Regions:
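Electrostatic cytochrome c docking/interface patches
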Residues: 2-17, 31, 51
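Intrinsic disorder/low-complexity segments
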Residues: 4-6, 47, 97
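Amphipathic alpha-helical interaction segments
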Residues: 9, 23-24, 51, 60, ...
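Short sequence/structural segments immediately N-terminal
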Residues: 11-19, 68, 95-97
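The canonical Cys-X-X-Cys-His
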Residues: 16-26, 88
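Axial heme c-ligation environment in periplasmic c-type cytochrome domains
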Residues: 31-46, 60-95
Length: 97
């Protein structure tokens, strides 16, 4: 993608499917085999989403998440642009009920 180019909803969904869905699920509930193993939060629950800001979500998506020495999520900096990461955060926000 070109820097600063705006992504379509289909582009954002494709990024979700490629990079996020294996653990977080198509619906954001985290009830996949990997999601259950890693105890991924259910993003359809608004209270779970209120526990993190957009900036925190962007940082985790960019840099990854660790618990001690254990990697819970790889970072996507270098694979996804800053705009693609922000768009994924907006996509996650739409799961909340």
């Amino acid at each position: 993608f070109l820097a600063g180019a705006s992504l379509t909803a289909a582009d954002v969904k494709a990024n979700w499917e490629k990079h996020c869905q294996k653990c977080h699920g198509a619906d954001g509930k985290g009830q996949t085999t990997m999601g259950k193993k890693l105890k991924v939060k259910d993003y359809t629950v608004a209270a779970e989403q209120k526990k993190f800001t957009d900036e925190e979500a962007n940082k985790i998506t960019s840099e990854g998440k660790k618990e001690g020495d254990k990697s819970l999520m790889k970072g996507f900096k270098g694979e996804l642009s800053e705009q693609e990461i922000k768009d994924l955060t907006a996509y996650v926000r739409k799961f909340a009920k």
